[in-house]
Regions:
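Conserved acidic segment of CheY-like receiver
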Residues: 2-13, 18-22, 51
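Short hydrophobic/Thr-rich beta-strand motif most characteristic of the beta2 strand and flanking loop
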Residues: 27-35
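Acidic, metal-coordinating helix/loop segments flanking the phosphotransfer/catalytic sites
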Residues: 34-50, 56-58
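Conserved phosphotransfer cores of two-component systems
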Residues: 44-46, 72-78, 98
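Conserved phosphotransfer microenvironments
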Residues: 52-71
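Alpha4 helix (beta4-alpha4-beta5 surface) of REC/receiver domains from two-component response regulators
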Residues: 63, 87-104
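A short, hydrophobic beta-strand element within the central beta-sheet of small alpha/beta folds
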Residues: 78-89
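C-terminal output helix
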Residues: 108-118
């Protein structure tokens, strides 16, 4: 059975790269969400195995940390693991501090440790 991943705030090319990475290692369906409002609505009404949030949302360049914080503060939706997509280690640390799993950067897709990190939720 396919695992479902919600991708929040990626541009179309980056979502394509994320889908190629994920589908080369796991049986996944990628669902795109452009912004915080849409993401929160989808999380409340659909089941996901993993949520990835871009550091800066492509639709309006808002802060992905706000999305993560909104998810983590809502007990009705904070059970799904969330990962930040960012190449910046300081951003990853901040995301972990507010409740996310340690994520990955767009330049790290094929690193074995990233495959293993994501695999905890998609195998």
């Amino acid at each position: 059975m396919k695992k479902r991943v919600l991708s929040v705030g990626q541009c179309v090319p980056d979502d394509g790269a994320l889908l190629r990475f994920l589908s080369s290692h796991f049986d996944v369906e990628l669902v795109r969400s452009p912004d915080k409002e849409d993401a929160l609505k989808r999380i409340r009404t659909e089941q996901f195995d993993l949520i990835t949030v871009n550091r800066k949302l492509d639709a309006d360049y808002s802060d992905g940390m706000d999305v993560i914080q909104s998810i983590q503060q809502d007990p009705d939706i904070n059970t799904t693991p969330v990962m930040l997509v960012s190449n910046y280690p300081d951003a990853q640390e901040k995301a972990v501090q507010i409740g996310a799993e340690y994520g990955f950067g767009k330049m790290e897709y094929e690193k074995p440790e990233v495959v293993e990190r994501v695999g905890k939720f998609l195998k």
